[in-house]
């Protein structure tokens, strides 16, 4: 009886991990372990298990992908996931989203949208966000803080940059909005 329960728990964790790899293809092991706070050894074992089963594979650059996917990571999504991971303890729900938003999550009763704005895309993304009124809080990922002055759209909670190794740095817009 006890063994079955343990296998079920393990199975649930494996299914959750597989779902995460499928929703956000290309995440590193470090990112995937952050989805399972306090259970990194279990999560590591499950990644190996899913890999041996042929359900997922690790690309040359270290990202994990579902079987059958081409190993091309969406760098903007990977940056947005680092932002999500800052809130993962409070996040009740998260999912990838449509352009210009990369992902959405619920935390503390609020809906957050994480959008990415590449250099030169400020006007385009703002235009897309204006038509996208949802009463959510928006976190805008930028390549550099110099872009912030060019971004003017509603419901922005803050801006951030994300380094290659996943360090997030948050900024408020000048003028306190």
Go through the PLM ranges and name each one:
Residues 1-16, 74:
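Short alpha-helical segments that sit at the start of domains
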Residues 13, 25-28, 52:
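N-terminal low-complexity or simple alpha-helical regulatory segments
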Residues 20-23, 52-128:
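Nucleic-acid-binding surface
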Residues 23-36:
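Short acidic, hydrophobic short linear motifs in intrinsically disordered regions
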Residues 31-32, 46-49, 60-61:
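N-terminal, charged amphipathic alpha-helical interaction modules
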Residues 37-52:
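Short amphipathic alpha-helical interaction segments
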Residues 117-169:
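Catalytic cores of nucleic-acid endonucleases
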Residues 173-175:
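Charge-dense, extended regions
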